[in-house]
From Swiss-Prot:
The gene is APX1. Belongs to the peroxidase family. It comes from the Eukaryota. Residues 1-16 form the signal peptide. It comes from Hydra viridissima (Green hydra). This is Putative ascorbate peroxidase. Its cofactor is heme b. Its EC number is 1.11.1.11. May play a role in the protection of oocyte incorporated cells from rapid apoptotic degradation. InterPro entries: Ccp1-like, Haem_peroxidase, Haem_peroxidase_sf, Peroxidases_heam-ligand_BS.
Length: 367
């Protein structure tokens, strides 16, 4: 009976251990993650930027919050396996036991966001306040417990804002700031049922130059400009299963067009940060229109914040950073500041392998 008791105690102790990476391992992880993000290209787009940010959001939803676990069987998580497969391969090969998977996922997103503003005047500085020590779920990287439902893009204003309040304890302004992450990436029919990207070149803050990334890989306030500066959005039916908003000048549904001809889109949850959106069916159909004389939409309480962010990119990046950090710091463990150089101790405890030199030049500019 005694061995069984000791085994139980050992399991409890192992389960409660908090992994804090050394300075050396933390620096190597940042560099290797940047290399991975840079290695996956689609023209001038780096899809892992949007992919890791989306992963962080989905990882932080549910009972365990940011716990390094994703239930890939849930429709709302469709498409994330391409992201986790790449991250998990790197993690399992080089960082397992040195940093928690939850920390690794969160660090990937923050590294990606840092890369997304590398050529911009308004920099994302979330790495400066990054914390470590997140606890993985017991079945990491696979989610084994029932988690919260992923918010749907077809949800209206009330449900969208309530989700951020219930899940992350966020006020309306914080929710509006966090939703600005939609400036990154695009929707695909096979993953979400929607089609298109939220932004295009019109409102990009990137300076002219061949080295610039696609607008879908740049963290700026173009998303708010699309909502505030382009008022006459109209609803279209996608594949008979979803309703999304497109500009009237491009009213052909995006799923019927080649990618080069597609219009930027907004979801109900995006329109919610400016308008009171009340879907009348499961598709997300809304009876009002922003410019309609007969059935005009009324502005929501979030509209004021969307207007502010549309006019002030620097302020939005600052507020987004705070909201994003608030989200990724949710975990049952008490987190600590990321390790800084601690002289002799870290030198003696570091590993002998050199840091990935292929991205050293990029790393110096970004980190």
């Amino acid at each position: 009976m005694v061995p069984v008791i000791w085994l139980t105690v050992l399991i409890v102790l192992v389960d409660s251990l908090q992994i804090i990476p050394t300075f050396h391992d933390f620096q190597r992880a940042k560099t290797d993650l940047l290399g991975l993000i840079e290695s996956v290209k689609r023209g001038d787009d780096l899809p892992m930027i949007a992919g890791t940010v989306r992963l962080a959001f989905h990882d932080c939803i549910g009972k365990g919050k940011c716990d390094g676990c994703i239930d890939h069987s849930k429709p709302g998580n469709a498409g994330l396996k391409r992201v986790t497969d790449r991250l998990d391969a790197l993690y399992d090969a080089s960082y397992k036991g040195k940093i928690s998977r939850a920390d690794f996922y969160a660090l990937a997103s923050v590294t990606a966001l840092t890369r997304s503003t590398a050529n911009l005047s308004d920099k994302y500085n979330g790495l400066r306040k990054f914390k470590v020590g997140r606890k993985d779920c017991s079945t990491s990287p696979v989610e084994s417990i029932d988690s919260s439902d992923i918010p749907r893009g077809s949800d209206g204003t009330s449900k969208t804002l309530q989700f951020f309040k219930s899940e992350f304890g966020m006020k309306t302004q914080e929710a509006v700031a966090l939703l600005g992450a939609h400036t990154l990436g695009r929707c695909s029919l096979q993953n979400s049922g929607f089609v298109g990207s939220w932004v295009d070149q019109r409102f990009s803050t990137a300076p002219p130059g061949e080295e610039n990334l696609s607008p879908t890989s740049i963290l700026d306030n173009a998303y708010y400009r699309m909502i505030i500066d382009i008022v006459p959005w109209t609803q279209v039916n996608i594949n008979g299963t979803r309703i999304q908003w497109q500009e009237p000048s491009n009213s052909i549904p995006n799923d019927k067009l080649p990618e080069s001809k597609r219009s930027p889109l907004l979801l109900n949850s995006d329109m919610a940060i400016s308008w009171i959106i009340k879907p009348s069916d499961a598709l997300g159909t809304v009876s009002c229109r922003p410019t309609s004389l007969k059935t005009p939409c009324r502005h929501s309480n979030a509209h004021t914040f969307a207007k502010i962010y549309a006019k002030n990119n620097a302020l939005w990046v600052k507020d987004f950073t705070k909201a994003f950090n608030k989200m990724i710091e949710m975990n049952e463990n008490k987190l600590r500041k990321a390790p800084i150089f601690n002289g002799y101790f870290d030198e003696m405890n570091s590993h002998d392998e050199p840091i990935n030199e292929s991205v050293d030049e990029i790393s110096e500019d970004i980190f």
